[in-house]
Amino acid sequence: MEVVAYYRISSVKQEKSQLGLEAQKSSVRAYCKAHNLVIISEHTDSAVSGSAPLESRSGLVDALASISSHGAQALLVAKVDRIARKMFVQLSIENALERMGARIISAAGEGTQEEDNPNAVFMRRIMSAV
């Protein structure tokens, strides 16, 4: 499966934490290796809040455009909260991906893989609201 990877940090201070870019990349790449996924492009937003609207996040906009133009099947993130901190923002991104025939996959496994499983969808909604 071909995927587009997306990484986000909200502050320079966060870079040195377990949510830093290198930690996210390591997690995503290990997940790809374990699940035979191929990253076709990688996109990053640095010093951007997860509550910022989509239009102010150039890395995420580029990631979605890459999925659309290359036909990737998923947007792969280290954790779901790297996509959005507000449920409405995450739902709008999920909706855009669904229209492209793609979905979100979290390397942390936060219920994002089993789209047909109501429990997984429920868990994803809970995680995006926290």
Q: PLM features: residue spans?
A:
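Short, structured surface patches at the beginning of a domain
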Residues: 1-130
